[in-house]
Structures are given as C-alpha cells and as structure tokens.
Amino acid sequence: PAFTVRALARKWGTRRTYLGAGGKGTAFGGACRSATGSQWARAMVCLMAMQGLGKPGVNFGNLQYGAPIDYNFYFPGYGEGGLSGDVETTGAAVQLYQRQPQLPSMNVVAQRITRNRIAEAILDGETHGHPIDPKSINGQFMRFHYPAPGHSRVRMMYKYGGSHFGTVQESNRLADAYRSSELEFVVNQSIWHEGESKFADVILPACTNFERWDIGEWTVAGGYSHHNNGQLNHRVISIQHKCIEPLGESRSDYQIFLSIMHRLGMGTYYSEGMTELDWCRAQFEASDLPGRISWEDFLEKGYYVVPPEDTAKTPQPVAMRWFAEGRRKDVPEPHPLPAGYGTTFREGLQTMSGKIEFEPSSLKMFDDPGRPPVNRYIPSWEGRGTTELYGRFPLQLVTPHPRYSFHTHTDGKDTFINDVEEHRVLVDGYYYWVARMNPRDADARRIAHHDLVRLHNDRGSVICAAALTERLAPGVVQAYASSAVYDPIGEPGRSPD
C-alpha cells in the first residue's frame, strides 16, 4: 500500500540507513534476478545516493558480506579459470595468470550464442543476443548475431556440466532442439545419467568427486566478482582427497579431456605434463597458502581455516568512504580497470562523469527500452496487470532461488536430500518437487496437503506435491525456481515434467 511506502520513506530519510538488500544475502538470488531486475538495482543505488553513500553508517552490505573475514588472503575461485589458461572468458587475468603461469588457451572461433537462445539457434537457424562484458559498460550493448558472417551453423553439441533444463525458461524448447534433425550429434559428459544426458548420442561417464583429486574453497564464486565470499562467516580451503579409483569405465573430467586431446595430438599441450594432483599443487602455490601452511601439512590435514583478519593491526578502508570524502579510491580491489574510470584513474566512479548519475549519460547513447536513461518501473508482461492471462491463470507463481539444490547439483541423485520435505515429497514411490499454496486456494480446488498438482501455463506443465501454508497470501503459489532434474512422464517437450 502507498501509506507503507510513504512511512518507509520517512523513516529512511530521517536517519542513517545501512542497506542490506540485494542478490548477495545468501550469495545468490534476489530481486535483481528478474526480467526487469536492473531497474530495481538502479533504484537501490539512487536511494543510497540520496542518503550520502559512503558516509558513516550509510552504505551497502549483505548479511555474510559484513563478516570479519580476511578478504585479502588470496585463493583462486572457480570463475578464475583454474588450469584452463583462458584469459578471455574467465577472471584469470586479474591475479591467477600472474601467480600461476600456464600455456594460453585461445578460442579462434568468434561466433557465440547466448545460452538462453541455444534452442532458437538450432531450431530456427539464427538468433541474437548481448554478451556479459565485465570489462566495460558500453560492451554490454554490443549486440551479436548468430550465425556470424563466415561461420557455419552448429551441428554438434558437447554438453559438459551444468543443467540447461533446470536453469532456462520454457525448457521444452531444449527438448525440441535436442531431437531436431538440425542437431546432428550430441555428446554428454555425465556422472549420474540424469536429465538431458538421455538426449545424447554418446555418453562419456565421468566419475564422482570421491574418485579424483581437487582443491577449492567453500562457497566462493571468485573471479566473477572480487572478494566474492558468500554464505559463510569464515573461509575454509580444502584438498579433496581421491578416496577410490573411478568405478567401471568412468574417468575424471580431466582424464576424459586429456584422452580426447591425445587423440587430437595436443595432449602434452593440454596437460603441460601434469597430473590432477600436480594441478592441485599449482593452485596451492599460486595462492597465499604457502605463507601459512606447507603443502605436506595441508595434504595431510586436508583443509585450512583462514583466520579472521586482525583489523586492529591492519585497519581496512571502508567501502565508498573515499567517494563520499572526494578522495582517490583506496579500496584494495582491481576494479574498475584503469581505462574504465570516467575521469582520472582512481578518481570517481565508472560513470562518464565519475559521479552517481540518476540519469546515466552512457544509457543516453543507446536506444534500449529495457534500460531507459531515467529509471522507472517497467511492469512485467505477465501477472495481475495482464488481464487476459490473469483470467486464464489466476494464481501467481513466485519462484525464489532453490534452497537444497543448485543446477541439479544435489537433486536427482537419490541422496538424503530427498528426505527433506521442503525439497521433495514422497508420493506413491516418487519424490516430487514441492509447490506451496494458501489453504483457501487449495480448498477452492479441493487440494489436500501433499496431493499431486499440475502447475501449468502456455509454456508447459510440471507435476508437484502441494504443501499448504498460511505464509503465502491467497492467489500466490511458491515453488523453487530451478535445479530440478528433467524427468518428463511422456514424450519430451510434449508432456508434464
């Protein structure tokens, strides 16, 4: 209601406000992750600008991001490329490539496809999109077209990792693309043979993490953004010991790729003569771990807990305080890149004026209805405001980020996660995804707790187990957004999931 908005505005405007909103409260998700979410994110910046962003008590922060951990202790994250040698599409160039020199990997194919348009590329033969360009603002508007001039259409797909069905909209499109004659050959590298691996012509069996060496830090998306430690109020780096040899004919992902590269005559270039354990040690040596623990002790213990930084001895600058006081940037992070500053290096922000712009000059250079220069509310094309659709589909589905699975990482593996009723419910021998709804909506449809229900719209349908709760308002249904294994009951793309 309007009076609630006005009350919040008065309370906000009459005292110092520290904003704990955004997609990083639990490391992923948030209001910004929607079709028009950039408008919400811009609004948050404008609200903090009116408070005086960077002044004492006036700043951004998100739950665990305020934890007193040592952000300066370096360990490479999964967005930094690992052993790939790729400095174009990973974050390796920021630190890792200098710390861990490796042979470069360059993809000479300039053609690209937006992941959410793979189905259109295969079925229609053409599509377009905009890249994610973390290096510049203007680069995000560089529209590309597929197929690119001088390039052929995609005829083969090599699917490794991830879950397209669980993380794209209208996934029936993918079922049609996989079965299309336009896609001549599909290889899938899979551990569990779930979901889309069943569409493959050739399946390369990968082993589990218990059957190979690895090294990593808990809950860190490093490389995608600097100091990206989320979900935990501590830092733990662990070595993943190889417990047993790979079962059956399975191999580790590294060994599968190495075998292919040997067939192509480039095995030595790919491996650089190193085993998986050698690469683990290379990552160890590239980090700040050698200054705290020896490789032998780390290997024996299996983990290292990074102590919280003693801020009394090494006080850290406050984020954005330099901006509020008109000083040069003194925060220990490499962004923006030197050429990204709007004015002088380390002075001001990445905008063209170096200031917070309520009407960004850069957006005036592009005619993009989804990113207007003056921020405004852009209504969704679906919802209660769309009369015709709302008449046919009177329940609004709300889909927050999953709590118990991530890109199918823990779903469909027949583990103890299935016993968590918030995740799946056992009905007649099958574990169903959960859809929560208000009891009044359920009564009107004669739905009881844990009855099977079919959620559907014009794009497709999913069979779930209903969970009745007063925590939802009437007219609203809640189910986790993604990360369920694709399991159609009939013809793929033509039957409920």
Residue spans for each PLM region:
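Intrinsically disordered or highly flexible coil/loop and linker segments, enriched in small
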Residues: 2-4, 11-21, 53-60, 163-166, ...
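Conserved active-site and cofactor/substrate-binding residues in soluble primary-metabolism enzymes
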Residues: 3, 38-45, 169, 181, ...
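A glycine-rich, hydrophobic/aromatic-adjacent loop/helix-cap motif
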Residues: 3-142, 214-216, 220, 368
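Acidic/polar loop patches that form or flank catalytic/metal-binding clefts of enzymes
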Residues: 6, 19-20, 53-62, 186-189, ...
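Active-site rim elements
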Residues: 31-35, 242-249
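Short, hydrophobic/amphipathic alpha-helical patches that form generic packing surfaces
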Residues: 42-49, 258-263, 400
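A cross-kingdom feature strongest in bacterial/archaeal respiratory oxidoreductases
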Residues: 50, 99-246, 284-497
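Extended catalytic-interface subdomain
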Residues: 237-240, 254-261
